[in-house]
Regions:
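Bacterial Sec-dependent N-terminal signal peptides
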Residues: 1-23, 27-30
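Extracytoplasmic Ser/Thr/Pro-rich, glycosylation-prone low-complexity segments
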Residues: 20-254, 260-266
């Protein structure tokens, strides 16, 4: 009966719209699914090596205001952040963290860090950095996911996190499924938060266990965490810890009642 209802819903979905599908909760951010929460078929980024920004800026699909400035696209980083500085496309993305944010004149700036740390994307299957836009105006969402990316120098440890930008409210959400600690490399440093274009304004997450900002030189880990950043004017954000409910970023697999694959994709 459940599969019958799902198939009818699937038919209606293809007839009526290209909207997202909500079926049941899941606790994993990435992978291949036949039951998903807020399913989002995303585009694979061009990043297939470490310490680089994506070759081109990617469109958000809507206007998003960050520290009071409007943007329509962003650049992805191999090291766990996005920046609205479009001149960074195809440029080096720093991995060394030797000073806290803000650090004027040094990347990342104009950035959302989820977190910024030294991770090691590479050729498949380690190039799984995806992005996409879902929903209908004026309530669209832009999502970036770093899925099971090895930590540099601790490649047995895999990092998974996600950034979601909301149209209209300009809210930011971050979901950290697995944020390991590689204490033997880069001082174990990782920075989670926001910084504006000139490093004048910044908002850093306070670790709920350690009671300190997740900024250099703090060593920290996270599992199945959710955070929201709500604009408080144009110079700061209110940060709240929220329930871990990421958008599933992967390939949707459609099957019939007998389990036969009908197709993949949105």
């Amino acid at each position: 009966m459940k599969k019958f209802i799902f198939i009818i819903s699937l038919i209606l979905f293809f007839v009526s719209s290209n909207a997202q599908i909500i079926i049941s909760p899941d606790t994993s951010v990435c992978g291949v699914y036949n039951d998903t929460l807020q399913a989002l078929s995303q585009e694979l980024s061009s990043i297939n090596t470490d310490d680089i920004h994506g070759a081109v800026a990617v469109p958000l699909g809507f206007t998003f205001n960050f520290y009071g400035t409007a943007y329509n696209s962003c650049v992805l980083s191999a090291n766990g952040y996005i920046t609205f500085d479009l001149t960074q496309a195809g440029q080096y993305s720093p991995w060394g963290i030797s000073a806290p944010i803000p650090n004027p004149g040094t990347m990342p700036e104009n950035a959302i860090m989820a977190p910024w740390q030294d991770i090691l994307p590479g050729p498949p299957p380690n190039n799984n950095i995806t992005f996409g836009t879902t929903g209908l105006a004026p309530n669209r969402r832009f999502t970036v996911t770093w899925c099971e990316i090895p930590m540099f120098s601790c490649t047995q440890d895999l990092h998974t996190s996600q950034i979601i930008l909301y149209e209209g409210s300009d809210k930011i959400e971050m979901f950290l499924q697995d944020k390991p600690l590689c204490a033997t490399w880069n001082g174990g440093a990782a920075v989670q938060g926001l910084v504006d274009a000139t490093s004048t304004n910044f908002d850093i997450v306070n670790d709920p266990v350690l009671g300190q900002p997740r900024n250099f030189p703090l060593q920290w880990t996270a599992t199945n965490e959710g955070w929201e950043f709500i604009p408080n004017g144009t110079t700061s954000y209110t940060i709240n810890q929220i329930t871990y409910v990421p958008i599933i970023a992967g390939t949707n697999v459609w099957t019939d009642a007998n389990g036969n694959i009908l197709g993949t994709g949105p």
